[in-house]
A protein has these predicted regions:
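Ferredoxin-type iron-sulfur electron-transfer modules in oxidoreductases and energy-metabolism complexes
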Residues: 23-41, 63-95, 99, 110-140, ...
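Glycine-rich FAD pyrophosphate-binding loop
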Residues: 167-183, 312-322
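FAD-site-proximal beta/loop scaffold in flavoenzymes
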Residues: 254-285, 377-451
């Protein structure tokens, strides 16, 4: 700890954003990274905690106090090494992680927490700028082969870890580009795809092979039988995510103009990449309604505003959370409180405790929603009598989360055992971690745990890689 009084001398300084009126004209990132002096001061705010709760609050267990102190002292290259020791892709988490570490920061008990995420962002950006982020190809090859199905954060983390210890790794991706959720689920204004592309290039030098347009299981023209992978590879990691969206089973669901968020968002990313997207779903000049109050819903809001929507309204079934948390009750855990994203700041009407009763159409196209107020008591929901109302809508986007992995194809072909929620069953404790019910098949990320954060997917990919390495070699030196 380099500055014992840093948390007293320096106030928390958040990263700045480009003004909304200008950033709405493009799809680039708009966050302004801290400069060296600002990052040093923010690192100085890190206290000499007896127990660094930030470390346990972070799913990948980043050694946060160490790299905060190193940034304060100006030792950026060593800070990057410490950061990379626990996280393969701080370029992603430094941009899109909600930072549960900051909720767990000891300062957060009675003041503003350390700006951990902004410091992480500054470290990795400086690392690339200075040329410190280099491939780490293995010195010796093991002769073992691993297939990774899915190129999202869990699959990429597992593939990189295994390649670095000498295994031959092939990543299979059903889409036309590598990246999974990072590529097509997260808007470019939150994560420009150049960050993803340079990581993929790094991994290719390390020996990872990527095969796109290849779906494992199923009957499409690009599909490959799951049994073929079992025959050709020594181990198989399933990291295909939880792609089955939660639907809205109400009258009018089949009207034109009603779409899942993951039909809407990927199209814009494809357009940004230079692709031609026939019949793109556009919000231009439309009254947009987003159903679902989470991050994906927020991404729909930001994208709709960039399209030039006439209006954007977001509905959430749950009641409005409090503006601030009771820290004496919630710390060091992630608190339930009102969160306003940059997309909300760009223009959006938000309403809570609202349920959709019916989608109303005209000539086969959605024109309105019939809504009702709901009350919550002891975890149960009831409608408020006489509260029904209709609001106009030309485009309805369903962003209510994801319920499970897709069963058809890969999971059915392998006849994998599922847990009670419909995810691939695989424990993270004891012997046989991440192993499924089928020999030499492992699962990690959202496909195993259900919908979650990118940082959790990275954690699971890293841990799964260690278990696969131990399975192949008898033991593993990879970190847990």
């Amino acid at each position: 700890m380099g500055k014992p009084t840093g948390f007293i001398e320096f106030q928390r300084l958040a990263e700045a954003n480009e003004p909304a009126e200008s950033r709405l004209k493009h799809y680039r990132e708009f966050i302004i990274t801290l400069d060296d002096e600002q990052a040093s001061q923010q690192g100085a705010r890190c206290m000499d905690c007896g127990i660094p709760f930030c470390n346990s609050g972070c799913p990948v267990n980043n050694i946060i106090p160490d790299w905060n102190d190193l940034v304060y002292r100006g030792n950026w290259e060593q800070a990057l090494a410490v950061l990379h020791s626990t996280n393969n892709f701080p370029d992603f988490t430094g941009r899109i992680c909600p930072a549960p570490c900051e909720a767990a920061c000891t300062l957060n008990i009675n003041t503003d927490p350390v700006g951990i995420k902004s410091i992480e962002h500054a470290i990795i950006d400086k690392g690339w700028e200075k040329g410190w982020v280099l491939p780490q190809p293995p010195k010796v090859k093991t002769g073992k082969t691993v297939a990774v199905v899915g190129s999202g954060p869990a699959g990429l983390a597992a593939a990189q870890q295994l390649a670095r210890v000498g295994h031959s790794v092939v990543v299979f991706e059903k889409s036309d580009r590598v990246g999974g959720l990072l590529r097509y689920g997260i808007p470019d204004f939150k994560l420009e795809k150049s960050h993803l592309d340079r990581r993929i290039a790094q991994m290719e030098v390390e020996g990872v092979e990527f095969r796109v347009n290849q779906e494992i299981g199923g009957e499409s023209e690009h599909s490959i039988a799951a049994e073929r992978l079992l025959a050709e590879f020594d181990a198989l990691i399933l990291a295909g995510g939880a792609e089955m969206p939660r639907d809205l089973p109400v009258p009018g669901r089949d009207l034109e103009g009603v779409h899942f968020a993951m039909e809407f968002l990927p199209q814009q990313n494809k357009v940004n990449a230079g692709d031609q997207v026939p019949a793109q779903i556009k919000a231009t000049g439309k009254r947009v309604v987003v159903i679902g109050g989470g991050d994906t819903g927020s991404d729909c809001v930001g994208t709709s505003n960039r399209h030039g929507a006439l209006s954007v309204t977001q509905f959430e079934l749950m009641p409005q959370p409090p503006e601030t948390e009771n820290k004496s009750l919630t710390w060091p855990y992630w608190p339930l409180k009102m969160r306003t994203s940059s997309s909300h700041e760009e223009g959006c009407v938000r309403d809570f405790a609202v349920s959709t009763k019916k989608l109303i159409g005209k000539n086969g196209k959605v024109k309105a929603l019939r809504l009702v107020r709901v009350e919550w008591q002891n975890g149960s929901m009831s409608e408020v009598a006489g509260s029904e109302v209709e609001i106009p809508a030309d485009l309805v986007l369903l962003a209510m989360g994801f319920v499970a992995p897709v069963k058809q194809g890969l999971l059915e072909e392998l006849a994998l055992e599922l847990d009670a929620r419909g995810n691939v069953k695989a424990t993270t404790d004891g012997d046989g971690c991440y192993a499924t019910s089928v020999a030499k098949v492992f699962a990690a990320g959202d496909m195993r745990r259900g919908q979650s954060l990118v940082v959790w997917a990275i954690r699971e990919g890293r841990q799964c890689a260690r278990e696969v390495d131990a399975f192949l070699m008898g033991s593993s030196d990879l970190p847990r």
